[in-house]
Amino acid sequence: MRSQLTEDMHTVQQMLKKQPSLLRKLTNVAEIKDFEPASALQYLNQQMQKDFPALDTTDYEIRYVHESMEDFLSPAFYLTPPLDTGSPNVIYINRAGSRSNLELFTTLSHEGFPGHLYQTVFFGKTQPDDIRYLITSGGYVEGWATYVESYGYQYAASLLSDKAAADITALMWKNRSINLCIYSLLDTGIHLSLIHISEPTRLALI
């Protein structure tokens, strides 16, 4: 993680050195015009086929979190279907909070295509032994969805009108990756190395 963090920070420094305007664009992210979650998932499903094996027609639906639960749930989540039916494949979107539609687009890449929805349906089509459904790993499942977020940022570039769209989305992903590395280093430092959160100097050396 340290090497990934160092590499990402170096890349960001080089990008901002060559294009200082990217920093302003990063904080004032361009919006995707005519954005709709359903069309975004269709677009992601189409785009991912150049990087991942295509699925047969996959039925899914979008639902919205009830307002009574908006303050307690994630911005979006994929609801894993029952084992014996494999359906419905449902993505819930939380309309609470303020986020750009570009952020929602990349969140849908995490939850939908090529993220959790794709991961679950593809896995089911491999006809795994039943025991594989009993043994699961949150790190494995979330690791995949986080990994493919980088593709979501790439796919979003063609939907932005800015000439530097590819660089903007690449910088956004690097920023996301840096944050994930920092969170992970703090997590392992505090819970594995038992560094107390009140020891900022030691935490900084993780």
Language model regions located:
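Acidic/histidine-enriched alpha-helical segments
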Residues: T11-K18, E61-I62, A164-I178
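Short pre-active-site segment immediately N-terminal to the catalytic Zn-binding motif
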Residues: I93-L108
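Extracytoplasmic/secreted envelope proteins and their assembly/folding machinery
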Residues: T6, Q13, A38-N45, V90, ...
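Post-HExxH zinc-binding segment in Zn-dependent metallohydrolases
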Residues: Q119-V121, D130-A165, Y183-D187
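Single conserved hydrophobic/aromatic residue that forms the stacking wall/gate
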Residues: I195-I206
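Active-site-proximal, well-structured secondary-structure segments within enzyme catalytic domains
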Residues: M1-S87
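Solvent-exposed, acidic/flexible segments
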Residues: R2, D34-L41, G97, N101, ...
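Catalytic Zn2+-binding segment of zinc metalloproteases
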Residues: G112-T126
